[in-house]
Amino acid sequence: SFAAQAEITLLKQDPQAGDPLSRLNFTVGGSIRPQFNNMTGDGDKGSYKRNGFDGGTRFRFAADYYLFDDISWISYYELGVNIPALFDWDHHYADGARNTSRRMLYTGLKSNTWGQMTFGQQNSVYYDVVGAKTDIWDYDMLAQAPGNGINGDYDGSYRSRKMLKYKNRFGDADVYASYLFSDSDYLPGNGLRYKRKGGGSL
């Protein structure tokens, strides 16, 4: 697979007295990720993965609003787009695949002194510490927690909703902590029902 990436700063933060908009830094970016897989010779001939599919195209929007001292209010939204499904390109996406997905949506406070506290759908502590450093090639995550649990976006191993997360650096140590709040039932479509009551990571 290969990707084309870009990020543009639409508003650059430069706080000025009497100008609330000058406190805002706003960026947009993303990556387009076409992918081709040929893992089993002719055994998968004609499959959408062999024909070419979307390997995780996403577009992101990030805002950083300076409040006072070294404290900022931050917000982040990342939209996943399945381009072949969006344009209905036959044999280039899985049956039933959605056109778009909400990859992340969170908000919170950031401080160089006190750290960062955010709430919403965001990368897990596990992904920040392990996944982000090893998720380099296609299928790297199959052997990680998100590839082995019921659903990484639900069980807390990847990008769970309703997550409160804190991170900060103390000397040479990076500290990450999170708490997962109860979520609605997850129905994978195989007759099973999962219910997340809570959870946490450190």
Give the ranges of each region predicted by the language model.
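Outer membrane beta-barrel
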Residues: D19-N37, Y48-S182
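Loop-centered beta-sheet repeat module
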Residues: D174-L202
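N-terminal periplasmic/intermembrane-space "pro-region" immediately following the signal or transit peptide
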Residues: S1-S31
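Solvent-exposed loop segments that connect transmembrane elements
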Residues: D42-D44, W89-G96, S184-K195
